Amino acid sequence: MKKKDLRSKEWFDNPKDPGLTALYLERYLNYGLKKEDLQSGKPIIGIAQSGSDLSPCNRHFQSLSKIIKDGIKEAGGVPMEFPTHPIQETGKRPTAALDRNLSYLSLVEVLYGYPIDGVILTTGCDKTTPAALMAAATVNIPSIVLSGGPMLDGTYKGKKAGSGTIIWEARKLHAKGEIDYDEFMDMAAASAPSVGHCNTMGTASSMNSIAEALGMSLTGGAIIPAPYKERENISFETGKRIVDMVHEDLTPSKIMTKKAFENAIYVASAIGASSNCPPHLTAIAKHMGIDFGIENWEKLGHDIPLLVNCQPAGEHLMEGFFKAGGIPVIMQELLKNNKLHKNV
């Protein structure tokens, strides 16, 4: 069977339109790439860079991107990094929800309009993950999600301090006059001890767990804390994997099936995921062409027990959840009890 031409060949090696090929080619050679890199059949891999100073939850991708690129090159691909619309949930309130769609639209335009054969979608903060998955569903080129991971566990006066969770508690204490302004700010700072997104089972951890449950990220990647060496390891492996996915023509439509969405609900229910997840998952499914409404959560998730004891519903934080096995252990438990589709 004839090997399928790479999508980027239309830009960089199209004898039918030498004029445009020359225009595309010469400008991509002005920063160190060689003609052979772009015309030898190597997949062009986009890295959707969601990290910036405006997006502190994802900021460490600025350093992780080198490791991602090394993985891509190791597997025989050519990395091309590009910025995404910045999203920081706490920095854009009360309009952060609108940024999900802005980020989605900007990703779609880049993925459609540029010579990209496959893409690594870097995620972390709440809306970055649904925006990335919606774009992957729409454009349907080989895509893989790479979460930046949660912060390390926070502590305040000897107790676990979960990002967000402790602030809601501090607001009550401040309103009652039990703490002053300075202590309020100290409590908030204690909950954010490192790089990474929220260390609770908030929307960020929940949506990245859903990406893993859908099959859109490497196994075990959702909950690795941002500063851990395993986060660098999975960044490298993700870079390698996307190159293989391009050669396999493994697109989101082959991964995000209806059964995969059902698995996402099973996992989300078991981990006590954020109540923001249903509208996000519905939107992702819609862009995948799958009718998957909110009613599925009651139908599929109603009898799934809560297996994860993490804040805000429970006691622990993400670092502890990772050490306990993370999402793979949850999926194994669900499989053992016939509450998860196999081979999806």
Where are these regions (language model features)?
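Catalytic or ion-coupling anion/metal-binding cores of large enzyme and transporter domains
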Residues: 1-59, 64-85, 90, 96, ...
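A short, small-residue-rich loop immediately preceding and capping a beta-strand
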Residues: 111-132, 143-148
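Glycine-rich, anion-gripping cofactor-binding loops and their flanking helix/strand elements
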Residues: 93-111, 325
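Short, glycine/acidic-rich beta->alpha junctions
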Residues: 102-103, 124-128, 259
